A protein has these predicted regions:
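Sec-dependent bacterial lipoprotein signal peptides
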Residues: 1-16
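OB-fold nucleic-acid-binding modules
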Residues: 17-95, 99-250
């Protein structure tokens, strides 16, 4: 009997240690740390790690498509998702935990991407809608006022990629006065992805507006404005993508 009790005690000890080891193997890291996994090609993340941050961009107002951008204090990462209404699953500005083990990671210039194993021309495939909440968990909210960084055009850096920034004192360049946020294809009558150019008097900022953006047909104010959005990559260049209609007059 004593032998049986001793055996059971040892077995429970081993199981308990195994659970402790599982907990130890799961650890948090920063978005910046994810760059250490990036190689010349898309690779799988083998380690049981997660990042915590805020949803700084999604498909709300049609500004992005099938994508959610999560940022912490060190940077941002885009997760490609096969869902038509990401906002209903991962609301803008919500606090989330992204479990990275098993996801594939790639570098699109200075832009960090997460998704599933690529099967075609894209760097990563989209995470199926049924699996989204397996990888991205909503967390209790706290003060998210610090997710927006104040910048000028001149102070934008590579490390700001996929983070939320706000830039004051911007004016549409004279050549584009009177324009809508997005151009309209004369053949189809539909809006198209458009690049607009703003200046602060010294430097020029390219702002990209998606064809699907809900305010694509609004006129751009011909006055000094503040724009808030994410730093993104478009046509090989760093640009600003306005998020949540982050347009206000100074």
């Amino acid at each position: 009997m004593k032998g049986i009790v001793l055996y059971i005690s040892l077995l429970l000890l081993v199981v308990g240690c195994g659970r402790d080891n599982d907990i130890e193997r799961t650890h948090s890291c920063s978005v910046a740390h994810l760059w250490s996994y990036v190689g010349r090609s898309t690779v799988i993340i083998p380690d049981d790690i997660y990042v915590e941050g805020y949803v700084v961009a999604n498909d709300k107002l049609g500004e992005l498509n099938k994508c959610v951008v999560v940022a912490d204090s060190s940077g941002g990462v885009a997760v490609n998702i096969d869902a038509d209404d990401v906002e209903s699953i991962l609301p803008l500005y919500s606090r989330v935990r992204v479990h990275c083990s098993g996801l594939w990671i790639a570098n699109n210039g200075t832009k960090l991407l997460l998704g599933t194993k690529p099967t075609g021309e894209y760097l990563v495939d989209r995470v199926p809608s049924a699996l989204i909440l397996n990888y991205i968990h909503l967390q209790p909210s706290d003060n998210s006022s610090q997710i927006v960084n104040q910048r000028t055009i001149a102070t934008l850096q590579d490390k700001d990629m996929l983070t939320m920034v706000s830039i004051d004192g911007l004016s549409l360049v004279e050549e584009e006065h009177g324009a809508l946020w997005a151009d309209i294809d004369p053949n189809t009558g539909r809006t198209i992805d458009t690049q607009r150019h703003f200046t602060d008097g010294c430097d020029t900022l390219v702002v990209v507006v998606a064809a699907s953006c809900h305010y694509a047909k609004e006129s751009i104010p011909n006055k000094s404005i503040r724009l808030s959005g994410i730093v993104d990559r478009y046509a090989g260049n760093s640009v600003l993508r306005v998020i949540n209609h982050g347009i206000s007059t100074n």
